[in-house]
């Protein structure tokens, strides 16, 4: 068998060295810039008393950091700007109530899941109509948060008079309570939490509605950042194994049975 040429050996050594340096660099990073939104409780929200972002995914980011040996610097970002901020390098990873979708995986990479949920249908508190799905809302004006998978869901149906988009769930619910829209679609656990906390008044979740967009909540990294993805996945496995993740979900009133 012919031995490897000197040129090939140098190229192979250089590639191996580059991979080792990349992995070592990821392991040496002591702090990450983490994108989170100010309006998505219980996943992420702005706590008025401390003037800081709090919630499930903030606790997850901190727990993952502790398990992985780094700190998480939370950066407040609008939901629609999370992925652009990540891909442009302003953020190192995203920790928010963002569902993994086929379209998003074309642009970014997702970690192992930390939770799973689907959409909820928000209606006026005095609306006693039957809503097993969205078809009863044909020719109505409905609302949805910009940048979410639920906009695509509504748009593909093509049955609505108008689809209005909002920067936050709070703005959307306010328009619903004022009668400006007939109904709205949003993150079921987010809306349920806000209603339990009496932060959303005059609205309710349609009790008979069955979600069709059930997805996984994950941490999100850039496509070219395999080393950070591996570091996060190892840390997620650790907080699942030792019960930390289950404790976080329980703290915020989420059903641990929905956890993948």
Segments (PLM) and residue ranges:
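Ligand-binding clefts/hinges and TM-proximal coupling segments of bilobed small-molecule sensing domains
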Residues: 71, 149-164, 202-205, 236-260
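A ligand-binding cleft/hinge motif common to bilobed small-molecule-binding domains
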Residues: 81, 97-106, 153-156, 182-213
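Short helix-initiation/N-cap motifs at beta->coil->alpha
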Residues: 58, 74-84, 129, 164-178
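A conserved helix-loop-strand patch within extracytoplasmic ligand-binding domains
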Residues: 70, 99, 112-158
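Alpha-to-beta junction loops
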Residues: 70-71, 88-96, 140-141, 177-190, ...
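Extended ligand-binding regions for polar small-molecule ligands
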Residues: 55-68, 127-128, 135, 140-141, ...
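Periplasmic-binding protein-like
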Residues: 38, 115-123, 196-233, 237, ...
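Extracytoplasmic small-molecule ligand-binding "clamshell" domains
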Residues: 27-98, 106, 231, 242, ...
């Amino acid at each position: 068998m012919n031995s490897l040429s000197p040129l090939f050996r140098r190229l192979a050594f250089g590639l191996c060295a580059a991979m080792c340096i990349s992995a070592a660099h990821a392991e040496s990073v002591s702090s990450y810039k983490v994108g989170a939104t100010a309006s998505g409780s219980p996943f992420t929200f702005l706590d008025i008393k401390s003037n800081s972002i709090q919630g499930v995914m903030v606790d997850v980011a901190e727990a993952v950091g502790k398990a992985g040996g780094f700190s998480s610097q939370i950066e407040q970002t609008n939901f629609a700007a999370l992925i652009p901020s990540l891909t442009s390098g302003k953020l190192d990873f995203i920790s928010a109530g963002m569902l993994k979708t086929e379209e998003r995986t074309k642009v970014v990479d997702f970690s192992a899941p930390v939770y799973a949920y689907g959409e909820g249908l928000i209606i006026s508190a005095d609306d006693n109509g039957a809503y097993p799905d969205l078809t009863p809302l044909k020719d109505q004006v409905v609302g949805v948060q910009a940048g979410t998978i639920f906009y695509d869901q509504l748009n593909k149906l093509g049955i609505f008079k108008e689809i209005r988009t909002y920067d936050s769930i709070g703005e959307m619910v306010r328009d619903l309570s004022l009668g400006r829209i007939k109904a709205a679609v949003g993150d079921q656990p987010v809306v349920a939490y806000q209603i339990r906390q009496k932060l959303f008044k005059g609205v309710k979740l349609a009790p008979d509605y069955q979600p069709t967009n059930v997805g996984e909540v994950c941490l999100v990294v850039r496509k070219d950042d395999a080393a950070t993805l591996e570091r996060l996945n190892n840390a997620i496995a650790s907080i699942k194994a030792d019960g930390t993740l289950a404790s976080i979900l329980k703290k915020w009133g989420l059903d641990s049975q929905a956890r993948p």
